[in-house]
Amino acid sequence: MSHDTDDKTYPYQKDDAELRRRLTPMQYEVTQHAATERAFTGEYTDTEDAGIYKCVVCSTPLFESGAKFHSGCGWPSYFKPLNGEVIDEKIDRTHGMVRVEVRCNHCGAHLGHVFEDGPRDKTGLRYCINSAALNFESRPENE
């Protein structure tokens, strides 16, 4: 992996054997090895239900449905995380590009990337997140 060196210690320490048992092969590859699921194949790409999207590894709430939008990119897209504490950003120099990788700030799981082509009337950001890195918890609209 040609991501910048990660010396950060995350609060939630993952046991690899336990993760391999608990996660699907795709969830494991995405969250632990920064793989990317194929566009338009993820479980949450078109989900419009009200609720919270949580880290599949540690269950930290990451995004709310109100921040989700249809970007047409093939992955769930959000214009902001739940708050400024839940996301960790790292420079990613893979595939001949320089991008900003997005990780769960509690466990370090790879989630996806953030780009500056989101809705201009919101934050201008597009958090492009792999469905395999998320679990969805449905909630009524008024909660």
Swiss-Prot record:
Gene Ontology terms, MF aspect: peptide-methionine (R)-S-oxide reductase activity; zinc ion binding
Keywords annotated in UniProt: Metal-binding, Oxidoreductase, Zinc
Cofactor note text: Binds 1 zinc ion per subunit. The zinc ion is important for the structural integrity of the protein.
Pfam family, one: SelR
Domain MsrB, residue spans: 16-139
PANTHER family listed in its UniProt record: METHIONINE SULFOXIDE REDUCTASE (PTHR10173), METHIONINE-R-SULFOXIDE REDUCTASE B1 (PTHR10173:SF52)
Name of the protein described by the UniProt record: Peptide methionine sulfoxide reductase MsrB
GO annotation (BP), single: protein repair
Cofactor(s) needed by this chain: Zn(2+)
Active-site residues, Swiss-Prot/TrEMBL: 128 (nucleophile)
GO CC terms: cytoplasm
NCBIfam families: peptide-methionine (R)-S-oxide reductase MsrB (TIGR00357)
Disulphide linkage map: none
Family according to the record: Belongs to the MsrB Met sulfoxide reductase family.
Keyword Metal-binding: yes
Species this chain originates from: Burkholderia ambifaria (strain ATCC BAA-244 / DSM 16087 / CCUG 44356 / LMG 19182 / AMMD)
Gene that specifies this protein: msrB
